[in-house]
Amino acid sequence: MAQFFKAKPNSSKQLSAKQSFSVHQLDHLGAGIAQHQGKVVFIPGALPSETVQAQLTEQKKNYARAKLIKVETPSAERVTPLCPHYQSCGGCDLQHMSLAGQREHKSAALVDIMAKFAGAEGNSVPALTGEGWHYRRRARLATLFDKNTKQLSLGFRASSSNQVVPIDSCLVLAKPLSDLIAPFAKLLNQLAAKSSLGHLELIDADNGHFAVIRITKSLNDKDMAKLAQFAEQHQIHICLQDNNGEFHGVNGTLLLPVYQLLDDKADATPVSLTFTPGNFVQVNAQINKAMVAQALDWLAPQPGERILDLFCGMGNFSLPLAKLGAEVIGVEGVPEMVSQARENAAANGLSNLTFYHGDLSADLSCEPWMGKIDKLLLDPARAGAFESLQWLKKMKPRQVVYVSCNPASLARDSAVLLERGYKLQKLGLIDMFPQTHHIEAMALFELAK
């Protein structure tokens, strides 16, 4: 049979052409969704109900991606981003949408993902919301040393890039920390070791403000004196982290950051949690308190109950649960955080609380310390708790509270719980990161009788 040459469409011309798109919704990553020639097109920066001009940047079999060029018909939810670094910084990717619009989108996306991938429809509860700006109590800034100008800049990574975007302030960082960025940049440029400095971590704790400077070689006495003087002038605790991961206070003493929980409850004394810079801590203090309070309300811990807290970290949920009378078993995969959790329990005088280091993907049901479990709290990383749920079916806790930072893994894991006889009773958004697309959630499951 004769073979005839047939020219393929000029894909490069299709990609370079600017076209008009009608956006009808957002995906769970905050990108606008449009239809074009039978394909779904994802357009970051576009909002529902908008007509936009965009340029195709990627063509796949079933979808395409495009770069927003111009908004022709703006949405009523579109606002002018307040941050001068918005276009280049990779952090706050929904600043162009009103705060109310962001929360409405996130709540709807959460319900949609759970219904679509888990077949679960829970009793939606009001979202946990707080301040839209200056809510972060912790941030890590990258350093960029220019070999030509011999100048060091502080900033955040650009979107989908390792490039550092220099900044002098941050509107989602706690105001006292944001105000320290420019002075710190000036200070670090005065150090002889500025070319060997790593990241700068800023922390706003209940016992003061903290800064951690990553160093790759020891600082001389003059540099140390400058840091100590800056710390005194700005009333901030500065420590250095060396190549071995050890921390050293610039004034000779090392003070660790602390935050409190239950300090707003009239019927309970507060618990204090100390944490080491570098270890995980929820960055939104206001929402973390609300999240812990909601988990306590849903689980209603009682004396005599045994509650298992998986992925317990340094005790963010474990200590408050134990404070209200339940016997709590906390399991964590990071040894350093288990040690910190044990120290926190001892410092708060809690004896009804034990912590264990364990591989959370392995079967822990046969461990001698496990025993009968009445209720379960899960707070996994983005990957979820799929492996853990495989052995938890043997435990059959009456209630499961699942705290999630990824709705996709929550939906997948929810399907497992539903198959095992649990019913989704409550589902709610946790708006931990306003101005960004990130969706966090809490779900309550109860074993069907």
UniProtKB/Swiss-Prot annotation:
Biological process annotations from GO: rRNA base methylation
Alphabetically ordered keywords of this record: 4Fe-4S, Iron, Iron-sulfur, Metal-binding, Methyltransferase, rRNA processing, S-adenosyl-L-methionine, Transferase
Domain called TRAM: residue spans: 12-70
Positions contributing to S-adenosyl-L-methionine binding: Q282, F311, N316, E332, D359, D379
Annotated source species: Shewanella sp. (strain MR-7)
Keyword Iron-sulfur appears in the UniProt entry: yes
Gene Ontology MF annotations: 4 iron, 4 sulfur cluster binding; iron ion binding; RNA binding; rRNA (uridine-C5-)-methyltransferase activity
Reaction it catalyzes: uridine(1939) in 23S rRNA + S-adenosyl-L-methionine = 5-methyluridine(1939) in 23S rRNA + S-adenosyl-L-homocysteine + H(+)
Pfam family, one: tRNA_U5-meth_tr
Residues bound to [4Fe-4S] cluster: C83, C89, C92, C170
UniProt-listed Enzyme Commission number(s): 2.1.1.190
Function summary: Catalyzes the formation of 5-methyl-uridine at position 1939 (m5U1939) in 23S rRNA.
Family, as annotated: Belongs to the class I-like SAM-binding methyltransferase superfamily. RNA M5U methyltransferase family. RlmD subfamily.
Active site: C405 (nucleophile)
Protein name stated in the entry: 23S rRNA (uracil(1939)-C(5))-methyltransferase RlmD
Top-level lineage group: Bacteria
